């Protein structure tokens, strides 16, 4: 099973890449985390938020099209479901049991296109706070590693 993070944005600071890579490399080979970046669309007087999100959605769709048909879609959204660490660990176990990959979608500055959110099987909220998009990558990778560590009774998660 592969966990694919599809994130709008590129040219992140080095500390973002370092943080993400640290948690990605900790994952076991049978549960890899892969990052696929999508070029953001620039907002302008002729490019309103809806147009920006639609164009970014087309790029995200191209990435999703390269994944398996059984790929589950999880959209990160401020109105999504809150998971505790233990609940996320249980969800990760369920996804592994069901098979197929999981794609986590991180939108751009204007968020994810509503059509993408409608296609998602799960809407996930990482925090009630507004977070920088680069930090969301690191936080998501860390939480996926933490969830996996719970399923393995690994000492990383000590709650």
Swiss-Prot record:
Functional description taken from the UniProt entry: Specifically methylates the pseudouridine at position 1915 (m3Psi1915) in 23S rRNA.
Give a single Pfam family match.
SPOUT_MTase
What does the record give as EC number? 2.1.1.177
Residues spanning the signal sequence: none
GO molecular function terms noted in the UniProt entry: rRNA (pseudouridine-N3-)-methyltransferase activity
User: Cellular location of this protein?
Assistant: Cytoplasm
Q: Which residues bind S-adenosyl-L-methionine?
A: 76, 107, 126-131
Q: Which HAMAP family match?
A: 23SrRNA_methyltr_H
Enzyme class label: transferase
What reaction does this catalyse?
pseudouridine(1915) in 23S rRNA + S-adenosyl-L-methionine = N(3)-methylpseudouridine(1915) in 23S rRNA + S-adenosyl-L-homocysteine + H(+)
Gene from which this protein is expressed: rlmH
On subunit structure and binding partners, the annotation says: Homodimer.
Q: Indicate what this protein is called per its UniProt record.
A: Ribosomal RNA large subunit methyltransferase H
Provide this UniProt record's keywords sorted from A to Z. Cytoplasm, Methyltransferase, rRNA processing, S-adenosyl-L-methionine, Transferase
Carries keyword S-adenosyl-L-methionine? yes
